[in-house]
């Protein structure tokens, strides 16, 4: 039973997104984040998303990624035609900033399948991004207002 020991502990973000196993996200937290970020976007719009890559002995290089914010209020659209739910995405902007993105993804995969999150797309996107940047995980952000685009990991068709 030693291998199952970690499953008995509550998920680190369960208090933020709702009780374990409910399959429902608490939209109030999404709405609060959305209001805050949309107000920042209105004051200081930033149409292109960028990311940086860090490697030992190398200068930090900016890198454009194939994501634009067309109709910021509804969804973030990728050039391959996929789109990301804005409510889910804006929540992850904030969560990634505190270094808990990995735990969040595990929680989402376990408990929120009703959101039609395609787990295989998450895995493929992580692999592709890590190949491009050569780093464990990415911090995507809007250049001007520093919004983390961790929502790129949550693709909803």
From Swiss-Prot:
Residues 1-22 are annotated as: Disordered. Residues 1-11 have a biased composition (Basic and acidic residues). Keywords: Mitochondrion. Its main location: mitochondrion. It is found in: Mitochondrion. GO terms for cellular component: mitochondrion. It comes from the Eukaryota. This is Uncharacterized mitochondrial protein AtMg00400.
